[in-house]
Each structure stands twice: as C-alpha cells, then as structure tokens.
Amino acid sequence: MKEFQFDTLWAVMQIMLGAFFWPALIVIILTIAAFCYLLIKEKGLVACRLKGSSLVGLLGGILALYLLFSISQASISDIGGPIDLILVVLAYFGGFLASTMLLYSIIGFVKPRSCACQKN
C-alpha cells in the first residue's frame, strides 16, 4: 500500500468498532454541534472551563483506547502496519477531543459563564 486512502481508514474503523461505530458517530456529531452552539452563544471559549475539561480529556483518550481494544477482536499485539498505528493514535486523540468537548459543553449548559477561577 503506497498511498493513503480514506476508504481504507473508514473500513478499518468500522471493523474495529463494530456495532458501536454508528452510535459513536452520532454522539460525536451532537457533541460538536453543542460545542459550536456554546462558542457562538458565549462569543468565545471560557479558558478556565477549557482547562478543566482538557484534564478530563487525558482520561478520555485512555478510555477510548480501552474501549477500542475491548470491543474489537484486536489486541495491542495485533498492531502491525502503519494504518493500525494511525488508527490507534486517532482513537486516542478522538477520545481526548470528544471527552474535552463533551465535558466543556455539559458544564457550559449547566453553569453558563461561571468558572471557579474567575473573580466576580
């Protein structure tokens, strides 16, 4: 395989995630929509909320890798080619970004414009 093809990446991702692929895709789309809505509503990012959410994002990336290997038939020893390694790295960063954006959005809807590090 000398060239990168998006179809291959898509097919391998569907095989690795199995039945969780489409529900995960729907949750990702809803999370992105909620995050963008908050950005427009608040006219920017709240730095304190983003900092706390990104710390949880580190755990979200690790959880994404755990879920990836627990729901698929693959294990860490099955990582052989470059496409497998690319998907593992993408899964970590996807879990990091998704959990960061999800927590940022949840906190933004529950406590709008409030942050512990802001002085009132």
Swiss-Prot record:
Membrane-spanning segments: 20-39, 52-71, 86-108
Disulfide pattern: none
Localisation per UniProt entry: Cell membrane
Top-level taxonomic group: Bacteria
Keywords recorded for this protein, A-Z: Cell membrane, Membrane, Transmembrane, Transmembrane helix
GO CC, any one term: plasma membrane
UniProt cross-references to InterPro entries, sorted A to Z: DUF5368 (IPR035308)
Membrane topology: Multi-pass membrane protein
Coiled-coil annotated spans: none
Descriptive protein name: Uncharacterized protein PM1478
Species of origin: Pasteurella multocida (strain Pm70)
